[in-house]
Amino acid sequence: YSHCFLEVGKKLLNPAGIVHGGAIYTLADSGMGAALYSIIGEGELFLTVEANIFYFKAVSSGTLTCESRVVHRGKRIAVMEAEIKNEGELVAKAMGTFSIYKGKKG
């Protein structure tokens, strides 16, 4: 499980004054990665291999929060889920598939 947040500021807004979808996706991907990182074993690393995001509502101010969880963790693949909310209201949902492999950090 992971909980992270992002304060909405002018640098995140597109010309229409709405948070850029890429910023919301980045929050979701980071949150899903943090949730997976909390359960991987010693010597294991991972990377995102596929992700989908669904946007439900535009955001122009406030604080974005991301709650992520592990849906399934296999030997080599993990499926993750993230919900992004603005002031408690659901604005986007993401699902991601991550490849888990043996490797050295850094």
Regions found by a protein language model. Give the residues of each.
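Amphipathic alpha-helical recognition patches that constitute DNA-binding helices
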Residues: 23
